[in-house]
Amino acid sequence: MLTTPQHYAYIKIAEGCNNFCAFCIIPHLRGRYRSRAVEDILQEARGLAESGVKELIVVAQDTSRYGTDLYGAPRLPLLLHELCRIEGFHWIRVHYLYPDMITDELLDTFASEPKLVNYMDIPIQHVNDAILRRMNRRGTRAELDEMLQKLRSRLPDAVIRTSLITGLPGEGEAEFEELCAWLRENKLERVGAFVFSPEDGTPAAKMEHADEEVAQRRAEIIAELQSRIMDEYNAARVGTVMEVLCEGEEPETGRCFGRTYADSPDIDGRVLFSAARSVSPGEFVMVRITGAEDGDLVGEMEENA
């Protein structure tokens, strides 16, 4: 049963997690990673398309690991190609791609499939190598930087979302400043800042970590930095024409609102736009961006859209 507006829906392709990050309880609660069979996923997806879903959002604790347990190797590219063949979907969005599993094959898949939106949700958490090792995160900062450079080169219009955690065990002022400097350099388009919260039963809960007040202040600094980065991103959109998925109308202003490919439901921004005709939720229209307002884009629907 759909629990989202009819024009978009989530499809879970796997359950559980094998990553065992030191701060996360999920593998202990949900068990080992278990992929669904390709045909099982496709059957559900076809039903969603037939019901009128226009945007399919692919999720799992780690979508990039899909298929490793069932087929002996990652099969996310294959699955995405098959999903793109289903008639009815206009956008297919993928969440939770782990940095070390973003391969050339996966990037080629995004580049070659028009339905796949270039929105990369990549849980990074931190970039200091010592903290990454302590938190049992795979990969290093150098490997992350190399992957991001390749991603930006292969998908120039990619929007990258991530979450960063402040106050992790081992994070002092130097490690925090390294994180800030990295964010200023890489200018990720979408970032959520969270304060480390020890989870009972995890290794990190037993480790010494930053004072909660200090961690909260650091999260606020990250949020302020990201706000400036997002303002730059929005300013660069002014004057362009973007495809927008309409989601409704503001009763108080009469303006329509919707999302671009750069915005996932509930967690990212919106586009507020005026329209000379009635626009239905779930309809795709072209909008000329004229400005920004409190983090959201503002525009006017193209008359021939």
Language-model segment annotations:
Residues 3-7, 17-19, 116, 126, ...:
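Short flexible coil/turn linkers enriched for glycine and charged/polar residues
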Residues 54, 90, 189, 283, ...:
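Short acidic/polar active-site loop segments enriched in Thr and Asp
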Residues 198, 206-305:
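Terminal RNA-binding accessory module
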Residues 50-174, 184:
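Conserved SAM/AdoMet-binding glycine-rich loop
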Residues 21, 41, 58, 94, ...:
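Conserved, mostly hydrophobic/aromatic
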